[in-house]
Design a protein with these regions (language model features):
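Hydrophobic transmembrane alpha-helices and immediately adjacent juxtamembrane helices
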Residues: 1-142, 146-258
Length: 258
């Protein structure tokens, strides 16, 4: 076997390890976020259905589901890559991965692919369960798949950056509570930004999470707060920027190599 094939075999092995890591505790990593999304659906659809203005001829419950799917997808993609790195750093076994002949790019690809698998799988399960509650149309499946893949890749990359930066579990918790959660909840998951005052509509458009959710929702209803092409450009731009930062951090060994 050539050296190149051995390296890619190592990449696949690391990817498989990361997938099995979350799959072995699927009740926590898959079932739990699905249940949380359903609770949001039941509570918010009941409380806000008559108070939040959404798209014409789109019931609020149907409007809510794509947002919940994408929210869970993003959070779980981030959680998978970030938790893997911080646990390895705290436990001290990150050294066994760093000693392998994998390049920083292969290391990134393995962690990212596993994070995307978890995020996409959780989102798909929520979609299947949500069909029992409402008939959800699909207008542009291409946009749905595009933003699901890009969103999981972006948050998977973000998770790797956070995992590299954090030295302790409480730092990671702070990152999730003060960065990921506010960006998620202020991205239009539960409302259309057109229902907001003009100032907050402008503020929302500086949130990259808004473009991921709005583009994803456009695939279901053919309606959105902004053009899906604008959302695509913004999401790709943020993904490329974060990927560049992440690869620079991995290449330099920042907070990974003594």
């Amino acid at each position: 076997m050539s050296l190149m094939n051995q390296k890619w075999r190592g990449t696949y092995t690391l990817f498989k390890k990361e997938v099995l890591r979350f799959w072995r505790v699927a009740f926590q990593t898959v079932a739990s976020p699905v249940l949380t999304a359903l609770l949001y659906l039941l509570i918010f659809s009941h409380v806000l259905a008559s108070h939040v203005q959404v798209y014409e001829n789109v019931p609020y419950t149907a409007f809510l589901i794509p947002g919940l799917i994408m929210m869970s997808l993003l959070q779980n993609a981030f959680a998978n890559s970030s938790s893997s790195l911080i646990q390895s750093k705290v436990m001290g076994n990150i050294v066994f991965i760093l000693l392998t002949p994998l390049s920083y790019l292969q290391f990134y690809m393995a962690l990212l692919a596993a994070a995307m698998i978890r995020g996409l799988f959780v989102g798909f399960v929520i979609y299947l369960v949500a069909l029992f509650f409402v008939d959800l149309p699909i207008v542009h499946v291409g946009w749905i798949l595009t933003f699901a893949v890009l969103g999981s890749a972006l948050l998977g990359t973000f998770g790797i950056i956070a995992g590299i930066w954090a030295d302790k579990f409480d730092q990671m918790a702070a990152f999730q509570n003060f960065v990921i959660m506010p960006l998620t909840f202020l991205s239009g998951v539960f409302y259309s930004i057109h229902s907001l005052p003009p100032f907050w509509q402008v503020v929302s458009k500086f949130n990259p999470f808004f473009y991921m959710i709005d583009g994803f929702r456009f695939g279901f209803f053919g309606k959105g707060d902004v053009s899906p092409w604008l959302s695509l450009v913004v999401v790709i731009g943020f993904l490329l920027g974060l990927a560049w930062v992440c690869l620079k951090m991995l290449k330099s060994g920042y907070k990974l190599r003594g």
